[in-house]
Amino acid sequence: MPTLHTPRRFYLLSVLILLSAMLFTHCGGGGGGDTNGTTSSGGASGASGASGAGGTTTGSGPASGAGGGGATGSGSAGTGMSSGGTAMAATHDVLTYHNDIARTGQNLNETVLTPANVNTTTFGKVGFFAVDGKVDAQPLFVESLAIAGGTHNVLYVVTEHDSVYALDADSGTPLWQVSMLGAGETPSDDLGCGQITREIGITSTPVIDRSRGAHGTIFLVAMSKDASGGYHQRVHALDLASGTEVLNGPTEVAASYPGNGANSSNGRVVFAPAAYAERAGLLLLGGVVYTTWTSHCDEGAYTGWIMGYSADSLQQTAVLNVTPNGSGGAIWMSGAGPASDGASIYLLDANGTFDTTLNSGGMPAQGNFGNAFLKLGTAGGLAVADYFAMSSTVQESKADEDLGSGGALVLPDVTDANGVVQHLALGTGKDDIVYVVNRDSMGKFNAAGDQIYQEIQEQLRGGEFGMPAYFNGRVYFGSVNDNLKAFTLTNALLSTAPTAQTRMAFAYPGTTPSISANGSANGIVWAAENGNMAALHAFDPATLAELYNSNQMGTRDQFGAGNKFITPMITNGKVYVGTTNGVAVFGLLKG
């Protein structure tokens, strides 16, 4: 069972709070691109410019779990669609990857940070919260939580050492810490590969539901290795105020699915925990926590899995394999979480088997959807409802130029020149082509040429290892060795060339931008730069002129080596950046 470490001065009060409440309530796919953790920083950042109880089922996708509660989000408004915020979400909460289930990356409730005060004179590093391992997942934030004998703004941080921390978001004071390791277990080894190194514990961004349980619940996936050499993947649900396991968790991840693909037996492909890692962020939608699985260092026979777990019970409620009669097709998206419009799920699948022979409905005849932009239906279980695959998808998979290195973004509803409301999503991967799909008719596969809403070529370079962000009619991309670029959305079409770009370029793995703003005003585009000396950057959203970077003042704001696939999290006047050994915190300087 997990071990709980609570600071002494808070322990008794925390237990009393919990007891009182109880009286009233019950990768692969990444291919060659997912490699070493840090690179040279470049010159751009200078002054210039144990098994769980029951609940796991196997099968071909039983009915999706019951239970109320929508998806979680940051509470931000103005995206033109439901943000999925829970009923109890506070103004500054950040409860899921990239702020909302559409994965727009925008926090529209930031009233402290503005373009006028984000500069080297008034803004900088205000703290560093040390933890016991790498922070690959985006930190999450809960405002005004009753915890540890008081009310705190709480930062939730997970590490590759299989630890979960609840920290006071302002001071960094530990409120509780819990380990996900069972007796005699360690985090997984990295199998001598640099994809996730040096240990693998909790890689993906968790998801929080404040309305579930006595104090709210954080859901996460942790990987471990036991003393006999066996690997485990488990879904956990922890009480926000105490860190104790709830919902009879954890649940051991196990699954099979009809098919004769990689690692199949007797007509079913089987999920082998040692072969997989949970890289992509979790999605909470309709009372179900969705997990998506990538290969563990591209070792062994693997396929593309999506699984759903009830947010009420942690029982497995849905299983889908998108390459059941083939191989590959893992889902990793450089850490981005699957996106949703509140009903369906959108994701980019990595290189793997794709059937160019289609059935009468235009679907791959053997059910293999490797290297494709997928729309998943959730009613009655998981199923591919629609998809788009490039006419060159097979060739791109063979060349490791797959789509799955990037994440999908659901755009707000937009109106075209004819007054028609369009429902769009977009994504790009290693081929640097921006694919904009109509969510109502994505285009499927056509060997003669792509049948797609819009396609923009030759404007990005280096491959996308992350995902874009959206704000005020602009979409921002940060691909490898490329400038951060803005494309403007007009009459439901993206500009065919960037309308603004930064002067600097971002080395591998590029950057996943995030946005802070107060509604449509005081917008700032934030981006983390990887490297031996990493950096946090802030840009004007219209011009992408640099407002600030953390290397401009010598060592004052520096925070050491970078982590790949890091997404800055901005809320309540602070910017939180995951690092190799903690979280760097930025805000307004005192005095």
Model region roles, listed by residue range:
Residues G32-A89:
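Ser/Thr-rich, Pro/Gly/Ala-heavy low-complexity intrinsically disordered linkers and tails
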Residues T555-D557:
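Blade-edge motifs of beta-propeller repeat domains
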Residues N446-R461, A497-R503:
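Inter-blade linker and blade-boundary elements of WD-repeat/beta-propeller domains
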Residues R9-L19:
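Sec-dependent N-terminal signal peptides
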Residues A486-Q501:
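Membrane-interfacial loop- and helix-cap regions that link adjacent transmembrane helices
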Residues L23-H26:
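C-terminal motif of bacterial Sec signal peptides marking the signal peptidase cleavage site
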Residues A90-T415, Q422-F445, Q457, R461-F487, ...:
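Mobile, glycine-rich extracellular loop/lid and propeptide segments
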Residues M1-R9:
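N-terminal secretory signal peptides that target proteins for export/translocation
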